[in-house]
């Protein structure tokens, strides 16, 4: 089995390029618009897509992403609906998709069933925000079980690991040793959301991560404009931009020009990091 994420980063390495990973919340403002946004973001230069599964109590998210989840849930978005949305995206695009979720909706759906359904729908990676370190191995077992029940023609579903500025060195070694796809480094402590500047410790932290893993390193949380994206791309292999995009969606709502506005902003980010 293979994985679109690994293939994507292999292409980026070959072209000596950095990756652009936008975040959007599935169902905000509607699942149909989510499909439109995914296609538009890829055309604008996105290399991977981080797709949020809306949840009513997103503790790691700032107010912008919290409100996006509320709008999506109010619009009737469900886990099954998100998987259907991924299938629709797959009719038009093969962009790697990482599903950004909390544990609660996964357990409510049924953990094993969730992993199988995600893989069948066309999800390439899972990023579980509140997964306790002690349960990492349990989630990996589920991923392995779901993969073993599917045809070899299916994509391999991987669990993306988060590393924070406060993660101890021994824990970084353990996380990096079992990681696949890429490492997601949280650039700042706290929740998601735009910041005025990038942490000065970022170059040092990324250099430390590279001592423990050859995997690509994506940096997210707080990157909100082209200048910040360009700065982060000097050190990381990929840049994640979320709240700034979600804020544009909120400002323009379910209108045709919303997709165009998001695409234009995404193009600025992609150009800044050397698309």
What function would you assign to each model-found segment?
Residues 32-39, 170-176, 223-239:
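Catalytic cores of alpha/beta
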Residues 67-68, 75, 162, 172-207, ...:
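Glycine/Thr-rich beta-alpha phosphate-binding loop at enzyme active sites
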Residues 75-76, 123-135, 158-167:
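Catalytic beta/alpha-barrel core
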Residues 207-215, 224-234, 238-275:
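Alpha/beta catalytic cores of nucleotide-metabolism and tRNA/nucleoside-modifying enzymes
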């Amino acid at each position: 089995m293979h994985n679109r994420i690994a293939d994507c980063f292999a292409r980026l390495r070959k072209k000596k390029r950095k990756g652009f990973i936008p975040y959007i919340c599935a169902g905000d403002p509607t699942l149909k618009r989510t499909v439109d946004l995914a296609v538009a973001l890829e055309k604008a230069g996105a290399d991977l897509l981080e797709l949020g599964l809306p949840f009513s109590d997103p503790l790691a998210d700032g107010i912008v992403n919290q409100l996006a989840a509320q709008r999506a849930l109010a619009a009737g978005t469900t886990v099954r609906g998100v998987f259907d949305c991924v299938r629709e995206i797959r009719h038009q695009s093969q962009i790697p998709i990482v599903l950004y979720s909390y544990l609660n909706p996964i357990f409510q759906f049924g953990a094993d069933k969730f992993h199988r359904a995600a893989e069948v729908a066309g999800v390439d990676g899972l990023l579980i925000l509140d997964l306790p370190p002690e349960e990492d191995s349990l989630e990996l077992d589920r991923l392995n079980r779901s993969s073993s029940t599917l045809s070899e023609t299916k994509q391999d579903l991987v669990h993306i690991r988060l590393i924070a500025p406060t993660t101890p060195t021994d824990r970084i070694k353990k996380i990096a040793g079992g990681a696949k796809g890429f490492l997601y480094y949280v650039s700042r402590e706290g929740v998601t959301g735009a910041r005025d500047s990038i942490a000065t410790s970022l170059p040092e932290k990324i250099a430390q991560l590279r001592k423990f893993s050859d995997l690509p390193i994506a940096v997210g949380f707080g990157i909100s404009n082209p200048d910040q994206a360009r700065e982060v791309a000097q050190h990381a292999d990929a840049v994640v931009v979320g709240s700034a995009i979600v804020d544009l969606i909120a400002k323009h709502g379910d209108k045709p020009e919303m997709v165009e506005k998001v695409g234009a902003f995404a193009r600025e980010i992609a150009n800044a990091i050397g698309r």
